[in-house]
Amino acid sequence: MGLTKQYLRYVASAVFGVIGSQKGNIVFVTLRGEKGRYVAVPACEHVFIWDLRKGEKILILQGLKQEVTCLCPSPDGLHLAVGYEDGSIRIFSLLSGEGNVTFNGHKAAITTLKYDQLGGRLASGSKDTDIIVWDVINESGLYRLKGHKDAITQALFLREKNLLVTSGKDTMVKWWDLDTQHCFKTMVGHRTEVWGLVLLSEEKRLITGASDSELRVWDIAYLQEIEDPEEPDPKKIKGSSPGIQDTLEAEDGAFETDEAPEDRILSCRKAGSIMREGRDRVVNLAVDKTGRILACHGTDSVLELFCILSKKEIQKKMDKKMKKARKKAKLHSSKGEEEDPEVNVEMSLQDEIQRVTNIKTSAKIKSFDLIHSPHGELKAVFLLQNNLVELYSLNPSLPTPQPVRTSRITIGGHRSDVRTLSFSSDNIAVLSAAADSIKIWNRSTLQCIRTMTCEYALCSFFVPGDRQVVIGTKTGKLQLYDLASGNLLETIDAHDGALWSMSLSPDQRGFVTGGADKSVKFWDFELVKDENSTQKRLSVKQTRTLQLDEDVLCVSYSPNQKLLAVSLLDCTVKIFYVDTLKFFLSLYGHKLPVICMDISHDGALIATGSADRNVKIWGLDFGDCHKSLFAHDDSVMYLQFVPKSHLFFTAGKDHKIKQWDADKFEHIQTLEGHHQEIWCLAVSPSGDYVVSSSHDKSLRLWERTREPLILEEEREMEREAEYEESVAKEDQPAVPGETQGDSYFTGKKTIETVKAAERIMEAIELYREETAKMKEHKAICKAAGKEVPLPSNPILMAYGSISPSAYVLEIFKGIKSSELEESLLVLPFSYVPDILKLFNEFIQLGSDVELICRCLFFLLRIHFGQITSNQMLVPVIEKLRETTISKVSQVRDVIGFNMAGLDYLKRECEAKSEVMFFADATSHLEEKKRKRKKREKLILTLT
């Protein structure tokens, strides 16, 4: 039996019109060895790389479905970590643009990502209150840190010590010892959410930003350094009073004697506060890579910059203060007052951290990033609330630095939501109009070819001939634009209220408008003499007016131009004859006003979409309701028939576009992609393209393919997608022996881990079958007294006729490192005995010892009770113990030998070139110089 009706599938073709999404952060990235030229910005589910110099998009890092919420470039500049709304993390290569590594561990949106100094570990914080530390090289999770009670806002690795500091919306700042994976210190000095934190002054100072205008500064003292007698106290400044020294000594004494359990690694003391100019909360707080410039901003459009002075600069400042104080003392003594035996000068926080300047952007700041150019110039790039990227530069070394805007990316999108879309008659040009501008896009290249300023646009269409466009505005005006010149030809006051809808007449000689002033007006095109030119230009003139009792929300002509449908605020749709304007039909049944409607190409059907979430299909001959469809989970915002068919599209506030069959009342397909409310859509005259706009600032193009769509298969795919979503939402299986404390298992059950577990189970089943077949084959050969050919398995032949045990090993090697533990966790215990026997075989052969040991130790940990109580497995475990120890020792010896060889080669190279070209050598030298200077200062202070 053939298909009764064939539908063709529409697929997502492109995302355009968005420069940067609001949920994520902007970061500088290094491409082709150039720093400070390229930025990565989140763009819905993708990441766009923009060239700030040319204002061009040069690379798109393709996402899947979820919106991007966080970006973090790796220290080597080769990779970019991207966090998503569903809690997944992908690491993209900036050279190829491919995302090869995926981490799944969080249940909610990623809020912060930070690499450690070498780029080997990545810390991720989420709205699910957990922090997970990932091993980037091994592509797996290391441990989960639990302790915060609300979303994580920031996480930072310390350079010198294996510690992590995190802040959250629970008002806490927590310090984690990564050797033991537990929280050893919680700072409770904040009364509101902590929105950001930075480490300064060689990680001896912490600055936190909360919901007030205060930046709190904390001094960090590490216990080892306090106990080190060679280290002088950095707080003792030349010229400081004995009283201050006594206080510091008393504090030091407190460090040693009255040591609280949480102060065993470090101690935090509040040093003071820096007052911001902004009164609202801190949105972002950051420091540049040199550690000299501190920047923060609130919910407004001002970035505040502070300079962290070096020790030399502070000393210079203190010397000046001292000189001034001595002069003052001399002046007092000359006036006959008693001279102080010693002049006291105290160093305040304002002496160390100085305000530099403020950068005022053109709109509210969503995020920013800082970078120092080789010429000493500071560059600050901003992602603004109105879909805009701006770059400012300034020289912080000048006495009064003036920020200068050097670059701006604007042409690729509107500043506000697009409220109306239209296709040209040849399907090539797309018009989009928002609150302040109209843009004309080339559909094939997605480039903006014309931008024109306008008032708040609500509806639009291309004038026949595609040389002019007409816009209806919120103030009730009609605006006529010429596309060739980009000029506004004419503005006409059409309605007293908002002009909600327009419909071009089928004979293309005029159009009709409906407004909030309860009237429908008819207009004709005409040519009038242009004052500035000898040629005539297009204009419009009003011919008739239809006055109604309610506000008009939508108007639509029937294709034969005999009828006019008018949607009113009283939830009805009234049909009038066009020639006499007499009333013909009233379509009532919607519970809320009809926002959108369209009439089919043959004039037989009218479909209406309402704020009550329903779409109703009516016959235009008698006004009977053929069917009422529950179309969306929120208001239906737009509805349009596909030309020359009874299929139509609807767009809703539930972020979805749906296609329907008005004859069979079937839901054909759902186009998902937008992340927020969809305002409007337009179907091209050919029906091959659909373009839609949303509150997420993006415009999306959907294309009709030649692929037939079968409804039963579509429903099956939807059910599968629902099941996959439900798998991710299931509770994590309990791991025996694991405590739900600070540190916990990092994985998350996903459909990929379930599939990986199924592959392992299938491989074990095949191994069992093949082993049984081989036993049978041996018995047959023995009975026959000759060698009988062994039947070969097609799966093993596909892998190159390998043995069943080698096939199992291949399956284990094929599982992603980040999904390995979770796959083993969902594996039933009945497969574990066979796996353990195979592991013993693999380790004896020396095959992938590291991988097999990782799987073995995890299985032993989660099935400890069942394995130890099973007498059959005792000899297997005993053998595993012997083979594992010997083989792991061999692997360790090989690594040790390789490291010794590399050390030898390093020494050889150094001896030849007589240059210490490894970074640790220079850092050791700098450390020695620093200690020597501190000792000299201490001697000066004591003398």
Swiss-Prot record:
Modification Phosphothreonine occurs at: 257
Chain positions with Phosphoserine modification: 240-241, 726
Cross-link named Glycyl lysine isopeptide (Lys-Gly) (interchain with G-Cter in SUMO2), sites: 474, 529
Tissue: Ubiquitous.
Location within or outside the cell: Nucleus, Nucleolus
Region (Disordered): 326-345
One Gene Ontology biological process: ribosomal small subunit biogenesis
GO cellular component: nuclear membrane; nucleolus; nucleoplasm; Pwp2p-containing subcomplex of 90S preribosome; small-subunit processome
One MF annotation (Gene Ontology) recorded for this entry: snoRNA binding
Keyword vocabulary terms for this entry: Isopeptide bond, Nucleus, Phosphoprotein, Repeat, Ubl conjugation, WD repeat
Binding partners and assembly: Part of the small subunit (SSU) processome, composed of more than 70 proteins and the RNA chaperone small nucleolar RNA (snoRNA) U3.
Protein function: Part of the small subunit (SSU) processome, first precursor of the small eukaryotic ribosomal subunit. During the assembly of the SSU processome in the nucleolus, many ribosome biogenesis factors, an RNA chaperone and ribosomal proteins associate with the nascent pre-rRNA and work in concert to generate RNA folding, modifications, rearrangements and cleavage as well as targeted degradation of pre-ribosomal RNA by the RNA exosome.
Name the record gives this protein: WD repeat-containing protein 3
Organism: Homo sapiens
Lineage: Eukaryota, Metazoa, Chordata, Craniata, Vertebrata
